[in-house]
Amino acid sequence: MSSQENIQPQELWSRISKSQRDLAKSILIGAPGGPAGYLRRASVAQLTLELGTAFFQQQQLSAAMADTFLEHLCLLDIDSEPVAARSTSIIATIGPASHSVERLKEMIKAGMNIARLNFSHGSHEYHAQSIANIREAVESFATSPLGYRPVAIALDTKGPEIRTGVLKGGPETEVELVKGSWVLVTVDPAFRTLGDAHTVWVDYPNIVKVVPVGGRIFIDDGLISLQVKKIDRKGLETQVENGGLLGSRKGVNLPGAEVDLPGLSEQDAQDLRFGVEHNVDIVFASFVRKASDVAAIRAALGPEGRTIKIISKIENHEGVKKFDEILEVSDGIMVARGDLGIEIPAEKVFLAQKMMIGRCNLAGKPVVCATQMLESMITKPRPTRAETSDVANAVLDGADCIMLSGETAKGKFPVEAVKMQHAIAREAEAAVYHRQLFEELRRAAPLSRDPTEVTAIGAVEAAFKCCAAAIIVLTKTGRSAQLLSRYRPRAAVIAVTRSAQAARQAHLCRGVFPLLYSEPPEAIWADDVDRRVQFGIESGKLRGFLRVGDLVIVVTGWRPGSGYTNIMRVLSIS
């Protein structure tokens, strides 16, 4: 996020000379003798030189000053610098390619904010070691309190999903299913670890009852398609429609079939207990279809896991249709496009993505965009141009987090994938039309008597009006930081907290830069507030958000504890 804020020239009248006012007018209305867009572009550059950099954010400045969205698009400049610091969080899946401490350190340096553990693969022992490695890698940055990088750990449940078994050669083996060949899909336990090119075991006993002759079975995000030709006591006799390489433990989709799996399996319950015991921060709940599925997960976490955030993954048609009730009881949403693109027509996935991100933005809840974002980087060092556009458009849609799956879990270039997503997000964030976005979010905000929420709206508007370089918020649970993030300030939200978990979970919220303050409380509460604010300022200077002369908005409470945030101050950095 940049350390500078955009402001409209007509708001500077009391601070600039008449010649500069005339110049500012030419920016907004054009000038005689040439195209308004060209003159606006040239005039903005001249005005910036005359006024210095204190009043304007430099990234995509001409587009940021636009009066309409179409004009904003026309004025985007490929030579403009990206934002100084990325505000969209990066979630990276940890697997064989990224399991080691050294590789995790590299990924943290590259920009990983949340580490995802996929419990569809691996044993509890394997994931316990992954958690230990992640924490060791994070602690290696703890020598400097100002440079410490809290990384959240997320447990992704298996959920009511169907998967294939293990192939004969072991978990790393792949076999090719050739188009036109015959494959037996069986539930016979004897084939659980003996799959091959002609026999595929699946872990759903009722598959022979719910898939009719003529029905289709999709494997591995739909890359492999089988059509059922015959059903007998051995299983489903199928013919390969679309072939490909089949690995172990791949996801299976049965489009159109009424799958009767429970929302929370016994395996999921065991995995959730494991997560509570190992203090994970987030649960990504797979295949959530209705609000009661979320309630079951919350109950399974128990009182010890009450502070764990539940992010519901929307992966089928039922989940999309019941989205509002799921959103209401969830802490956030993941747009899981892999399975979703099989359960609903692929050409409608973008509609579901935009709808879900928009509703999450209105509700002020985090939303993650996931699956196949940089898929080609599993085997190649550079993404396709379509993939870079996909990541950028997820950011422009309003996603709080963007996720890497196989790219970092099993890919050849896990660190490079994180770096690429980081670079794309920085460019995309510079192109967000913040002027329109904040106005729409503010208008859509319901009337509230909650002092914290009212203060958050005021702080974000003040940051726009005075061109604040950052908003520093002191928070105990992270709620104040999330409320500030809801209104998408262009300034960095520096969240100072003594809660390690709140610092880690803050990465779910766009534009929030969490700081863990580990000093003991001062005897006088006002002194303690000042010390934490100063800690935030020093960190902002270190990260490049703040410079001498910049204004910052400070949001604090009127007394110790959570739920009392209602004070806003404007400070100048000295």
Curated annotation (Swiss-Prot):
GO molecular function: ATP binding; kinase activity; magnesium ion binding; potassium ion binding; pyruvate kinase activity
Alphabetic keyword roster: Allosteric enzyme, ATP-binding, Glycolysis, Kinase, Magnesium, Manganese, Metal-binding, Nucleotide-binding, Phosphoprotein, Potassium, Pyruvate, Transferase
Catalytic activity: pyruvate + ATP = phosphoenolpyruvate + ADP + H(+)
Record-listed ATP binding positions: N118, F119, S120, H121, R163, K250
Protein's UniProt keywords contain Ligase: no
UniProt: substrate binding residues: R116, K313, G338, D339, T371
GO terms under biological process: cellular response to insulin stimulus; glycolytic process
Reported cofactor(s): Mg(2+); Mn(2+); K(+)
Activity regulation as described: Allosterically activated by fructose 1,6-bisphosphate.
Record-marked site positions (Transition state stabilizer): K313
Binding site for beta-D-fructose 1,6-bisphosphate: T475, K476, T477, G478, R479, S480, W525, R532, R559, P560, G561, S562, G563, Y564
The protein's annotated pathway: Carbohydrate degradation; glycolysis; pyruvate from D-glyceraldehyde 3-phosphate: step 5/5
Function of the molecule: Pyruvate kinase that catalyzes the conversion of phosphoenolpyruvate to pyruvate with the synthesis of ATP, and which plays a key role in glycolysis.
Similarity field: Belongs to the pyruvate kinase family.
Disorder named in the UniProt entry: Defects in PKLR are a cause of inherited hemolytic anemia, an autosomal recessive disease of the Basenji dog that closely resembles human pyruvate kinase deficiency.
Name of the protein in question: Pyruvate kinase PKLR
Taxonomic source organism: Canis lupus familiaris
